Amino acid sequence: MAHKAPSVITCKAAVVWELGGPVVLEEIKVDPPKASEVRIKMLCASICHTDVLCTKGFPIPLFPRIPGHEGVGVIESVGIDAKGLKPGDIVMPLYLGECGQCLNCKTGKTNLCHVYPPPFSGLMNDGTSRMTIARTGESIYHFTSCSTWTEYAVADCNYVLKIDPKISYPHASFLSCGFTTGFGATWRETQVSKGSSVAVFGIGTVGLGVIKGAQLAGASKIIGVDVNQYKAAKGKVFGMTDFINPKDHPNKTVSELVKEITHGLGVDYCFECTGVPSLLNEALEASKFGIGTVVPIGAGGEASVAINSLILFSGRTLKCTTFGGVRTQSDLPVIIDKCLNKEIQLDELLTHEIQLENIQAAFEILKKPDCVKILINF
């Protein structure tokens, strides 16, 4: 029997039409996958702060656009060269690839692959889109390697990870960016040492990933810093030992508060997860003189940040990261296994659920103090 070629699919997607505009539900057409691509039926997706920045033109203002880069789905169809993937596979679309053969991949020191780097063009590798507005035929840009706020998406197979179908789909969605970024920053990027001290600025999903990673690494003191008192309880669930709410100490800087509970020394590692530019210098000051390491993780959308060079000359290390240094094919399955064996438990991340058609409401939910992670159901 001849194999039936996949056809165009008409479905619903969340579209941003202009810079700073609302996210609206549109009927779109999704083309079949080309040679090394797969078409994915999304099972669920989630919302990251970077998606909010996407609606504001980050990293490049390309519109109309479908946001979303966290999610999990099932492969509906594959191109003829979609290596190792088949219809029915449960997958995570990712914004990084890993060829395993380029200079960077061979060093084992970075997750930034020369062959499959983070894509920012909003288009597939051939310079075209697989998505169009159904009523007008207008081409739609996707976000990073593919967009997830849509019932169907197309991705290059090199930016897709086949996962164990036993994992909770919401948990898999949370692992496709935020939590993994924080966890990986302690594991892959800095190798947090046993008995060390850690400070985490911002206890959102990324910050909670840092806290759990630091706990599993054996850090003796894990200090969470957040102006939202609700986050204190969340932080403790993931392994935080101390909590600082700067609002309770209006006459002191964050670095002063951190030093007060570290015998005036500061911490071995400080992770800045808010993206607030002024806090980067505070993170540096909160780290130990001569040996402290600071990792900025939060996506603030700022093109540049002023750094006090005198702090750097004091022997501190500033180490930046993408996806926490986690290699998508080599490392991410290890984190998934930790979730499957309950070494990492992610139930506490999920605070709200919405249907795709209510996507605009999510932007108001994000402002609520008890919001950590919003799951989008299809």
UniProtKB/Swiss-Prot annotation:
Disulfide bridge map: none
Cellular component terms (Gene Ontology): cytosol
Tissues expressed in: Expressed in flowers and disk florets.
Pfam families named among the record's database cross-references: ADH_N (PF08240), ADH_zinc_N (PF00107)
Enzyme Commission designation: 1.1.1.-
Binding residue positions for Zn(2+) 1: 48, 69, 177
Binding-site positions, Zn(2+) 2: 99, 102, 105, 113
GO molecular function term, any single one: S-(hydroxymethyl)glutathione dehydrogenase [NAD(P)+] activity
Pathway: Isoprenoid biosynthesis
Record CDD domains: liver_alcohol_DH_like
InterPro entries linked to this entry: ADH-like_C, ADH-like_N, ADH_Zn_CS, GroES-like_sf, NAD(P)-bd_dom_sf, PKS_ER
GO BP: any one term: formaldehyde catabolic process
Entry keyword set: Isoprene biosynthesis, Metal-binding, NAD, Oxidoreductase, Zinc
Enzyme's top EC category: oxidoreductase
Entry's cofactor comment: Binds 2 Zn(2+) ions per subunit.
Cofactor names: Zn(2+)
Binding site for NAD(+): 49-53, 202-207, 226, 231, 274-276, 297-299, 321-323
Assembly notes: Homodimer.
Family from the record: Belongs to the zinc-containing alcohol dehydrogenase family. Class-IV subfamily.
Protein name: Alcohol dehydrogenase 1
Organism in which the protein naturally occurs: Tanacetum cinerariifolium
